[in-house]
From Swiss-Prot:
Residues at which [3Fe-4S] cluster binds: C45, C51
Domain 4Fe-4S ferredoxin-type: 35-54
Function: Ferredoxins are iron-sulfur proteins that transfer electrons in a wide variety of metabolic reactions.
Domain of life: Archaea
Gene3D superfamilies linked: 3.30.70.20
Binding site for Zn(2+): H16, H19, H34
Species of the source: Sulfuracidifex metallicus (Sulfolobus metallicus)
Residue positions where N6-methyllysine is found in the record: K29
Protein name from the UniProt record: Zinc-containing ferredoxin A
Biased composition (Basic and acidic residues): 9-20
Residues covered by region (N-terminal extension): 1-36
A GO MF term: metal ion binding
Amino acid sequence: GIDPNYRTSRPEVGTHEGHKVYGPVENPKVLGIHGAIVGVDFDLCIADGSCINA
């Protein structure tokens, strides 16, 4: 799953559509974690919710 401490354990590498992006990022294959309040790891999840354990 996503590292709950990603905001401190990963470098902030930029922004996308107004939210922070945490690296590493190596487009097009490694996309990093997007968001600071709700983080989505685009390398683990495609943001459709299917990767979330509830």
